[in-house]
C-alpha cells in the first residue's frame, strides 16, 4: 500500500515539516510505497537550475526511501506548463519540463508519473493537443519503463468521454489514467471538486 504525499500537503506547505521527511512519516504509519508530489518541493520549484535541483531531489529521496525500506511508486507532476495548450511553443516547453520528471521517476525506480492536461477549453483542440503531448511523452517514457498516467483534475479534464478520447488517441500502451473519484466537476470556477468550489 502506498501513501500519496498530498495527504500531508498542508503540513509540508506550512514549513513545519520538510517534504524530505515523507519517507519517514509513511514508514511510521505502516505504508510500503511512496507517491511524491513535485510541487511540494520548493528547493526544486524555485530553483534557477531545475535539472540540477531535480537530480538532487532524486538523490535525496533514493537515500531516504532506502533508509526506511520504502518503494518509490509515482511522481505527481504539477505546475510544469500546459500540455494541452494551443500555443505550440508553450506546449513543447511543457513537454521538455515533464521529461525531466519522467527521467527522475526512472532513476527512482518508480512505475509511473502523473500529469495534468490543461491549457485549452475548446474540446476538439484540447483533444488534439493532448494526444500529441501524451504520445510524445509516452514514447520518451517507454524505454525508461515509466507509465504516463493522467488524472481527472477538474474542468475539461474531468469530462470522462473527452479524457478517454485523449488517452486512447495516443495509441500508447504505457499511457493511462489515475482516477480521482472526487474530482468529476466540470466547473471553471473553483478547484473543481464535488466537495467545494462551484460544484
Predicted feature locations:
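Short, small-residue-enriched loops and turns at beta-alpha junctions
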Residues: 42-44, 80-83, 120-123, 154-157, ...
Amino acid at each position: 500500500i502506498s501513501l500519496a504525499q498530498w495527504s500531508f500537503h498542508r503540513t509540508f506547505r506550512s514549513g513545519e515539516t520538510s517534504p524530505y521527511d515523507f519517507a519517514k512519516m509513511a514508514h511510521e504509519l505502516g505504508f510500503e510505497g511512496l507517491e511524491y508530489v513535485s510541487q511540494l518541493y520548493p528547493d526544486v520549484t524555485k530553483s534557477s537550475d531545475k535539472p540540477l535541483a531535480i537530480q538532487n531531489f532524486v538523490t535525496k529521496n533514493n537515500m531516504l526511501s532506502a533508509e526506511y525500506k520504502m518503494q518509490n511508486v509515482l511522481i505527481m507532476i504539477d505546475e510544469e506548463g500546459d500540455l494541452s495548450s494551443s500555443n505550440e511553443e508553450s506546449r513543447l516547453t511543457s513537454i521538455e519540463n515533464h521529461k525531466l520528471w519522467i527521467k527522475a521517476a526512472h532513476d527512482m525506480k518508480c512505475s509511473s508519473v502523473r500529469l495534468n492536461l490543461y491549457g485549452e477549453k475548446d474540446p476538439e483542440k484540447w483533444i488534439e493537443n493532448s494526444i500529441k503531448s501524451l504520445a510524445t511523452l509516452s514514447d520518451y517514457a517507454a524505454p525508461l519503463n515509466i507509465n504516463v498516467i493522467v488524472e481527472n483534475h477538474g474542468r475539461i479534464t474531468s469530462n470522462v468521454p473527452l479524457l478517454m478520447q485523449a488517452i486512447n488517441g495516443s495509441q500508447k500502451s504505457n499511457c493511462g489514467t489515475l482516477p480521482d473519484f472526487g474530482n468529476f466537476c466540470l466547473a471553471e470556477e473553483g478547484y473543481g471538486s464535488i466537495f467545494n468550489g462551484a460544484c
